[in-house]
C-alpha cells in the first residue's frame, strides 16, 4: 500500500504534538524531508512480547517493493519506518497491540511533496494474517487509511486470490498494493472494486469489494490501513470515516479501522453510510456486527451530505446454510460512524387503497304489467342528452343547455297500463332526437313549440290519453310517442313578421283501429298547409305565404317536410322594376330571388325539425343606348361636351353640386341629401315620388347607393362631365376603393310589379366591379375622349336634367346595395314559438321577417339584393 505524505503549514503543530514519538530534528530537515520524501527506511522495533518475526523488507519510495516470505505463524503488520512521516502525520502511526502469540511488523516509506502532488510510487505496506491465532489475542490496529482496503480486501490494482485459498492455507500472504494518485487523486478520491467469490450461491456481490469469509469462528483479522499527505492533515483535525472497505470477523473482538482524509471532512460533519462498502466475514455464530465503516473521496461528498444507501453495495459472505441474506444490508445494519451524529433510518411502509365498486340494481318500475307484457324496449330511449324519468303522466322536458336534450318520458298510469296482458309496448318511448329540444306538453292533442336557443326548434306534440287507450288489449303501441302532426296546423301570426305554429293532432286519426293496429305506419297522412299573411311595413303592404308540405313517409322514425316561402309580386320568384326617365342611360336591373326551405327532418320521438333555407340570387343589367339628347351637339352649351359620342355610346360622370335632388319626397340626414347616396353620407329619411312605385329608404350608408364612395354620378352634359378620373377610385359598378357600403340593409320597395324585401348586411358594391371608368356595357372606355368642358348644372334649360320636373320623375328609383344574408332567429320566452328572422339594410330601417314553418330553422347563405329596373 502506498502511503502519501505531504508537508504543510501544520508541520510544526504535528511536530509539537508528536515530540515524544519521534527523534528530534530541525524544522528545515523536516521540511526538506517532506518535500523530497524519506530516503531511509528503518524497521521499527517490534514489541517485546512479540516473537521474532521476519520483517518485510521494503525498498525506498521510488523503488519496487520486494517482500520476503512470511511464516504462517507470524503474520506481519506494517509499521512506519520513516520517522519524518510520523512528524508529518502523527495520526498515521500504527499502534500494534502486543499479543502472546502474534507478531506484527509494518514497513513504510513515504514520498515527497512533488510525488504526492503529481502521484508516484509511495510506500507499500503489507501484512499477513494467520488463521491459527486465537481470537482473544488478536491485536488491534489503528492505522487510518483513505484508500487501502484491509488485508482481506485487496485493492483494485491487485486482484485477490481465490477465497478458498485465503481460507484453507495459513501461509498465504496477501499483498494489497495501490498506486498513489497524488494530491489530486487524493482530492477526488478513488474507489476500488473487485469481484469476489463466495462459497454460497449468492452471485450478486460481484460488484462489491472482495470479502473473504473466515473458515473458523475464532479467526481474527488485523486490519491495517495507512494514510497520509495533505488530505490527512485536515482529516487528522477532523477524524472521520474510512473511504476504504474494512474487513472484520464478527466473532472476534471489534476491530475498528478509521481512515481520515480531506474528502472525509464533510463526511464527518454529516455522517452517513459508507459510499465504499465494507466487507465483513460472518460465520454462522450469532455475533452482532459492530463494524465501523466510513466513506470518503470527492464522489462521496454529496452522499455524505445526504446520508442514504451506499452507492456501491457492501458485501458480506455468510456461511448460513439456510438462505442468503441481502449482502447490502448485513454490514450497515449496526454500523456506527466514527464521527458526527448518526441519523437513524426509519422504514416507510406503504398502504394500498382498495376501490369499492358500486352495483346498480335493476329498476322495479317496469313491473306494472302482470303477466304477458313484453317490455322488451322499455325504455328504448336514444337521446343525445340525459334522460331522467319522473312519475308524471305527461312527458316533462327540461332543457339542459345548447345542443343537449333532456327527455323525461314516463309511462302513464292510465294510458300505457290499460292493456293488462297482451300489450307489447316494445317502443315506449322510441325517442331518437336529432337536435336539442325542450318538450313541454300542454294538454291533450296540443303542441307547444318552445325554442331553446339560436337555431333550435322545439316541438311538443303529445298524444291524447284517450287516443292510445281505445285499443284495450291487443294494441302493441309500438309508436308511442311516435307522433308527427298529421292534422291541421294552426298558424297564428303573433307580431311583425313572426309566425307561431301550433299543430294539433286529431284524436280520431290514430284511434280508428281499435285492437289490432300496431300503428307501424302512423302517421301516413301528409297534408299541405298554406298560410298567407299580409302585413304593413312602413306603410307598404306586404304579403307572405307559408306552404308546408309533408312528403310521403317511408319510415316511421324519419319524415321530411318542405317549406317554401313566397313573396308577392310574382309568385315564389318575384321581380321588381325601378324605372327612371328613358331619356338618359336607360338601364334595366333584373333581380331574381328564390327562397326554398327543403329538408325538414322530423324525429318521431323528439319531434325535432331541421329546416335548411336556400337563397338563390341573380341580377342582370340591360343598358340601353343612351339617346343623343344632351350628349351630342352640346358643344355650345357652357363649353364643349364630349361631342365625340354618337348613338350607341354613353358614359357615366360625376356630379359635385348635388342639386338634382328628388322633390317628390323628403330627404334628411347627413351628406348632400342626394337620393343617389353621396360620399359624405346618404339620405336619411323617406323618399317617395310619383313613379311607378314607392320606396322606403332610411338608415345610414357609408357610401353611395351604388356602392361607390364619392360624388354623385351625372350623365353627359352635366357639370362635372369631363375625362377626369373619379376622385375616390370608386364606381357605381362597385369600385374596390374605400367607402363601400357597409352595415345591413333591408326594406320593401314597391315597384310596378309588386313589392320586394331586401334584407341583410352589405360590404362592398353589389355590382362587384372594380374599375374607375363609368362606362356602360359595350363601350371600350372614355379615357381617350377629348377633354371637354361639361355642361352647367341642372338649371340649364337645354339640359336633360334641367329642371325639377325632370328630377322629379326619378324620385322613387333607387337600387339598394347588395347584402349578405345571415339568418338570425329571435325567440321569445312564451309557450308559443315566435320564429323571427330579421335583416336590416343600410338604406332602410324596415325589418322583414322570414316566415318559418313548424320546427323550421331558417339558415340563409347567399345574397338578398333588391330587384328592379333602374333608368339613369
UniProtKB/Swiss-Prot annotation:
Residues 846-872 form a propeptide. Residues 43-65, 84-110, 125-171, 208-225, 242-260, 274-293, 349-363, 741-760 have a biased composition (Low complexity). Keywords: Cell wall, Glycoprotein, GPI-anchor, Lipoprotein, Membrane, Secreted, Signal, Virulence. The GPI-anchor is attached to the protein in the endoplasmic reticulum and serves to target the protein to the cell surface. There, the glucosamine-inositol phospholipid moiety is cleaved off and the GPI-modified mannoprotein is covalently attached via its lipidless GPI glycan remnant to the 1,6-beta-glucan of the outer cell wall layer. InterPro entries: DUF3246. Residues 666-692, 701-710, 731-740, 761-771 have a biased composition (Gly residues). Glycans are attached at residues 92, 290. Residues 66-83, 495-506 have a biased composition (Polar residues). Residues 1-19 form the signal peptide. It holds the Pfam family DUF3246. One of its GO terms (cellular component) is side of membrane. It comes from the Eukaryota. This is Probable GPI-anchored adhesin-like protein PGA25. It comes from Candida albicans (strain SC5314 / ATCC MYA-2876) (Yeast).
Amino acid at each position: 500500500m502506498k502511503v502519501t505524505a505531504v508537508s504543510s503549514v501544520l508541520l510544526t503543530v504535528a511536530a509539537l504534538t508528536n515530540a515524544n514519538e519521534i527523534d528530534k530534528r530541525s524544522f528545515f530537515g523536516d521540511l526538506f524531508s517532506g518535500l523530497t520524501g524519506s530516503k531511509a527506511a528503518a524497521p521499527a522495533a517490534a514489541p517485546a512480547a512479540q516473537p521474532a518475526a521476519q520483517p518485510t523488507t521494503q525498498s525506498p519510495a521510488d523503488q519496487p517493493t520486494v517482500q520476503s516470505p512470511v511464516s504462517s505463524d507470524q503474520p506481519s503488520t506494517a509499521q512506519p519506518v520513516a520517522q519524518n512521516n510520523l512528524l508529518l502525520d502523527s495520526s498515521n502511526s500504527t499502534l500494534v497491540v502486543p499479543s502472546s502469540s502474534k507478531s506484527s511488523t509494518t514497513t513504510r516509506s513515504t514520498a515527497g511533496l512533488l510525488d504526492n502532488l503529481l502521484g508516484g510510487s509511495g510506500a507499500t505496506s503489507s501484512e499477513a494474517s494467520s488463521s491459527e491465532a486465537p481470537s482473544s489475542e488478536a491485536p488491534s490496529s489503528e492505522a487510518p487509511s483513505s484508500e487501502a482496503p484491509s488485508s482481506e480486501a485487496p485493492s483494485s490494482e491487485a486482484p485477490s486470490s481465490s477465497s478458498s485459498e485465503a481460507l484453507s492455507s495459513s501461509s498465504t500472504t496477501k499483498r494489497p498494493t495501490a498506486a498513489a494518485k497524488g494530491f489530486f487523486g487524493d482530492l477526488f478520491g478513488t474507489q476500488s472494486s473487485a469481484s469476489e467469490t463466495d462459497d454460497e450461491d449468492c452471485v450478486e456481490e460481484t460488484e462489491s469489494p472482495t470479502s473473504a469469509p473466515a473458515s473458523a469462528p475464532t479467526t481474527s483479522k488485523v486490519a491495517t490501513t495507512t494514510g497520509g499527505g495533505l488530505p490527512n492533515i485536515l482529516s487528522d483535525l477532523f477524524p472521520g470515516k474510512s473511504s476504504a472497505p474494512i474487513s472484520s470477523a464478527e466473532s472476534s473482538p471489534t476491530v475498528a479501522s478509521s481512515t481520515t482524509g480531506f474528502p472525509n471532512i464533510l463526511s464527518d460533519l454529516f455522517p452517513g453510510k459508507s459510499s465504499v462498502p465494507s466487507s465483513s466475514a460472518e460465520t454462522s455464530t450469532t455475533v452482532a456486527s459492530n463494524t465501523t465503516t466510513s466513506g470518503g473521496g470527492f464522489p462521496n461528498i454529496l452522499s455524505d451530505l445526504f446520508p442514504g444507501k451506499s452507492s456501491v453495495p457492501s458485501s458480506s459472505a455468510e456461511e448460513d446454510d439456510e438462505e442468503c441474506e441481502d449482502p447490502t444490508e448485513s454490514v450497515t445494519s449496526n454500523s456506527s460512524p466514527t464521527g458526527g451524529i448518526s441519523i437513524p433510518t426509519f422504514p416507510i411502509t406503504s398502504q394500498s387503497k382498495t376501490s369499492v365498486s358500486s352495483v346498480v340494481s335493476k329498476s322495479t318500475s317496469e313491473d306494472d304489467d302482470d303477466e304477458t307484457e313484453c317490455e322488451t324496449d322499455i325504455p328504448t330511449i336514444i337521446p343525445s342528452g340525459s334522460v331522467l324519468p319522473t312519475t308524471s303522466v305527461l312527458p316533462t322536458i327540461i332543457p339542459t343547455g345548447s345542443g343537449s336534450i333532456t327527455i323525461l318520458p314516463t309511462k302513464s298510469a292510465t294510458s300505457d297500463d290499460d292493456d293488462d296482458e297482451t300489450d307489447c309496448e316494445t317502443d315506449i318511448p322510441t325517442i331518437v332526437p336529432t337536435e336539442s329540444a325542450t318538450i313541454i306538453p300542454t294538454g291533450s292533442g296540443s303542441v307547444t313549440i318552445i325554442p331553446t336557443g339560436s337555431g333550435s326548434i322545439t316541438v311538443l306534440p303529445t298524444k291524447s290519453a284517450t287516443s292510445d287507450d281505445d285499443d284495450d288489449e291487443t294494441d302493441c303501441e309500438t309508436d308511442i310517442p311516435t307522433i308527427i302532426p298529421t292534422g291541421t296546423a294552426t298558424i297564428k301570426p303573433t307580431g311583425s313578421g313572426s309566425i307561431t305554429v301550433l299543430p294539433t293532432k286529431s284524436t280520431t286519426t290514430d284511434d280508428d283501429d281499435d285492437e289490432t293496429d300496431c300503428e307501424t305506419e302512423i302517421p301516413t297522412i301528409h297534408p299541405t298547409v298554406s298560410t298567407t299573411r299580409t302585413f304593413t311595413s312602413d306603410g307598404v303592404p306586404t304579403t307572405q305565404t307559408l306552404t308546408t308540405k309533408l312528403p310521403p313517409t317511408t319510415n316511421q322514425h324519419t319524415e321530411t317536410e318542405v317549406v317554401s316561402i313566397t313573396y308577392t309580386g310574382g309568385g315564389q320568384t318575384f321581380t321588381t322594376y325601378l324605372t327612371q326617365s328613358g331619356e338618359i342611360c336607360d338601364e334595366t336591373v333584373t333581380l331574381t330571388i328564390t327562397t326554398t326551405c327543403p329538408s325538414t327532418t322530423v324525429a318521431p320521438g323528439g319531434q325535432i325539425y331541421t329546416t335548411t333555407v336556400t337563397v338563390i340570387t341573380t341580377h342582370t343589367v340591360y343598358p340601353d343606348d343612351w339617346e343623343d339628347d344632351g350628349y351630342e351637339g352640346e358643344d355650345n352649351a357652357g363649353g364643349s361636351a364630349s361631342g365625340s359620342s354618337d348613338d350607341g355610346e354613353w358614359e357615366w360622370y360625376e356630379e359635385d353640386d348635388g342639386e338634382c335632388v328628388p322633390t317628390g319626397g323628403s330627404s334628411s340626414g347627413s351628406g348632400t341629401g342626394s337620393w343617389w347616396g353621396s360620399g359624405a353620407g346618404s339620405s336619411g329619411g323617406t323618399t317617395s315620388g310619383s313613379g311607378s312605385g314607392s320606396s322606403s329608404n332610411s338608415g345610414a350608408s357609408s357610401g353611395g347607393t351604388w356602392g361607390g364612395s364619392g360624388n354623385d354620378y351625372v350623365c353627359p352634359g352635366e357639370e362635372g362631365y369631363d375625362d377626369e378620373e373619379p376622385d375616390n377610385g370608386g364606381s357605381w359598378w362597385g369600385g374596390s376603393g374605400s367607402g363601400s357600403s357597409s352595415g345591413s340593409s333591408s326594406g320593401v320597395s314597391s315597384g310596378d310589379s309588386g313589392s320586394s324585401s331586401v334584407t341583410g348586411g352589405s360590404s362592398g358594391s353589389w355590382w362587384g366591379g372594380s374599375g374607375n371608368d363609368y362606362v356602360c356595357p359595350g363601350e371600350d372606355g372614355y379615357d381617350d375622349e377629348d377633354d371637354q368642358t361639361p355642361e352647367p348644372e341642372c338649371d340649364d334649360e337645354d339640359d336633360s336634367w334641367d329642371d325639377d320636373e325632370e328630377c322629379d320623375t326619378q324620385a322613387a328609383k333607387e337600387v339598394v346595395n347588395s347584402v349578405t344574408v345571415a339568418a338570425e332567429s329571435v325567440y321569445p320566452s312564451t309557450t308559443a314559438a315566435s320564429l323571427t328572422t330579421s335583416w336590416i339594410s343600410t338604406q332602410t330601417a324596415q325589418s322583414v321577417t322570414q316566415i318559418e314553418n313548424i320546427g323550421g330553422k331558417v339558415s340563409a347563405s347567399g345574397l338578398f339584393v333588391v330587384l328592379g329596373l333602374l333608368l339613369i
